[in-house]
Amino acid sequence: MKTDLKHGDFKQLDKNLWVLDGELPHHLPLPRSMTVFRMNDGGLWIHSAIALDEKRQRQLESFGRPNYLVVPSKMHRLDAPAYKQTYPSIKVVCPEASRAKVEEKVAVDNSCENEFQGSEIKVHTMPGAKPIELAYELPLASGGKAMVFNDLLVNVTEVKGLMGRLLKFIGRVGAFRSPPSNKLILINDRALFHQWLDTQARRNDVKIITVAHGDPVTEKISQRFTEAAIQI
C-alpha cells in the first residue's frame, strides 16, 4: 500500500477496537481518523480507511484479516481504491444513498444497511439526518458499545495555522459537535436530529465514540451527546 500522506500510529481503545489519525491532502489542517474493529469471526471492519505505510500495514494485518471496507460517504473515498488493490477480497460497503458517488472511485459490493442486517454491527439511519451517511454501533469486549460517526459529528479541538483558524471560524473545529455547515449539507430536520442525539444521551451503554475527524470520546459520553444536541 502506497501513501504520500503522513499518519500516526494505531491507538487501541478496547480489545478489538483501534483508531489511527492521518492528514488530508494539500496540507489541510483538519485531521482524519480511521476506525478498525475486529469482528467475532476475527475479520476486520475498517471505517474511513487511511492508506498506510508498510509498518502500519503489517500492524493492521496482525489485528486480523481485512474483511470489510466501509466507505462512509462520497467525501471519504480517497484511499478506498488502495485498500481494494491491496486486499482484493475485501468487501466494499457504503450507505445505499451514497453508492452511486462511491462507485465513481471503487466498486461497491453491498450497502451497509443490507450487509450488516442481523449482524453484530448495528447500523443507525439517524432521524433528521440525510441517509448519505450512517452511524454504526459496535459491541465492546469490555462491555457496552462503541458508536462510530463520519462527518455528522466531529471532535477536533486544536488546529494550527491560518487555515486552522479559518476552519475554527466557520465551525469545523470544536469539541464534540455537529459543525454548522451540516445544517445545510447533512441535516434535513434539526428537531428530529436533536431528539435522536438526546435519546443517545439517555443511554448508559455507550462507552466510546469515534469520529472521522478528531479524537475519540471516552469519558462523559452522555454529557457529550447532550452538548452536541444543544448545538443543533
Language-model segments: residues:
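Pre-active-site segment of Zn-dependent metallo-hydrolases
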Residues: H26-N67
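Zn-dependent metallo-beta-lactamase
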Residues: M1-D41
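Metallo-beta-lactamase
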Residues: K2-T3, D9-K11, P25, W45-I46, ...
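Hydrophobic, well-structured mid-protein blocks that either form specific transmembrane helices
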Residues: P88-P139
